[in-house]
Amino acid sequence: MTETAKSEAVAASDIPKGAWVDKYLPARLRPYARIARFDRPIGTWLLLFPGWWSVSLATADWSPGASGVGQTLWFFVLFGIGAAVMRGAGCTFNDISDREFDAKVARTADRPIPSGAVSVRQAIFYLVSLSLIGCLILIQFNPFAIGLGAASLLLVAVYPFMKRITYWPQFFLGLTFNWGALLGWAVVRGDVQAPALILYAGGIFWTLGYD
């Protein structure tokens, strides 16, 4: 790539400049924060909200007492960490899968993998590390919720490739990003019932709207 092409790619890059990543992280850690999109937390919030909504919905008609309230808050914390970590894992997997396409597009050519800031091997190791943290969070829940959470990995694995075969990748993004609507209910109640399914369906349409 020529210097002119590099300059044009940087100018068109979707990586925000001057974010907290640039201000506070050591230079060697910045590419890893960027590949996980920690510099763009909106995606984490969009993944997190359905889970929080579902936990709140599942506990709305309960009177659990002080210990139950503490447990609900703990679920909120676990979902928060889990959303950040698994969104990062999903973005890393997406960038690994799309690295050849990203290298040819000005908007994405400056991303860590196509730019050479992170090798594919390093990205895979990072993906495994994030996934292990996600697993540690998932096993804090009941067996049904653990199985349900693990099932979401199929959607995570499929989504990057849907962009290549359908004009509606947002639908598959909605299926993936709103899985927390099912998981939140399952974490509290140990099953999935109609309110969670309705919330999940609504979340999918919400994703179609914002994406």
Task: Give the label of every model feature segment.
Residues 37-57, 178:
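The first (N-terminal) embedded transmembrane alpha-helix
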Residues 1-5:
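Soluble N-terminal domains of membrane-associated systems
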Residues 28-43, 117:
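Membrane interfacial helix-start motif at the N-side
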Residues 33-34, 111-195:
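Intramembrane alpha-helical segments
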Residues 50, 181-184, 211:
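Hydrophobic cores of alpha-helical transmembrane segments in multi-pass inner/ER membrane proteins
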Residues 52-97, 107, 131-138, 146-157, ...:
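Membrane-embedded alpha-helical segments that form the functional core of polytopic membrane enzymes
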Residues 7-30, 91, 95-118, 211:
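Cytosolic, membrane-interface loops and tails of multi-pass inner-membrane proteins
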